[in-house]
Amino acid sequence: MKKISIWIDGIKDVRMDSLEENIECDILVIGGGIAGLSTVYNLKDSGKRIVLIDKNKCGMGATSCNTGKLTFMQDLIYHDIESNYNEKVARLYLNSQKEAINIITSIIKKEKIDCDLTKTNAYVFSNDEDKYKNFDKEIEFYKKNNIRYKVLSSLPLNYPSKMVLETYDSYVFNPYKYLIGLKRLLKDKISIYENTRAIRLDKKNDYYLCTTSDNYEIKSKVVVVASHYPFFIVPYFTPFKTRVEKFFIGASFSNDSKNIQMT
């Protein structure tokens, strides 16, 4: 079985060189996914010297494996936010999601990026009657915030469902093709280096020094870390993901079953 994202299967891309010298810049962006390239896109006319690096090819990380959905409807999230915080916070989150959708679709249309952008509807469904009350609470939030919706008894697909909530103004697109479009648009305006892994980031007096796995250095006034996971340990932060270098359990038993030694 071929294990490859449907977004990148059969898609050709322009390869960028890897970093092979020490350089300086005003802004360094680490990570060439949708966060990194979107950041660079919005800075492209700033007049700053901008460098973007990615440990592999741009867009081959988390972005290439996402759902390809642009929707403010993410399960029954607004009911959850409202329950844990308040309606104002839930509304702020809703507006942020709508703004993100508008930003991406506007860029696609303005730059004429071919990424299969299609307007569609979004759905949340359940067959668990115990969860129906949560649908009612989500609908109440929709009503208060003028969100168009429809309650259905089945999905458009041939999939069993009893409670279906449908909303409008969502999109689907190929995120990898979108990033390819951004990269081609930006490659002549900024410096993009692929297969360039950042392994160390040090704060100096008035600049940052990023060291790569090939022992090259990037001196920058500002650094944007747009990688899926941070590649460095931040003081007072707990690492969410670390590499397991070695793990084993050994045991020796004596005649006394209570005497067990673990290593």
Which ranges hold each PLM region?
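Dinucleotide-binding Rossmann-like beta1-alpha1 core, especially the glycine-rich loop
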Residues: 73-152
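Helical element adjacent to the flavin cofactor pocket in flavoenzyme catalytic cores
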Residues: 141-143, 164-221
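Flavin-dependent oxidoreductases
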Residues: 200-263
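Helix-loop-beta segment of a Rossmann-like dinucleotide-binding subdomain
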Residues: 87, 114-124, 153-181
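N-terminal Rossmann-like FAD-binding beta1-loop-alpha1 element of flavoenzymes
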Residues: 23-52
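Redox-cofactor binding/interface segments in oxidoreductases and associated redox assembly factors
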Residues: 30, 72, 225-226
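Extreme N-terminal leader/targeting segments of oxidoreductases
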Residues: 1-27
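Glycine-rich FAD pyrophosphate-binding loop
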Residues: 45-65
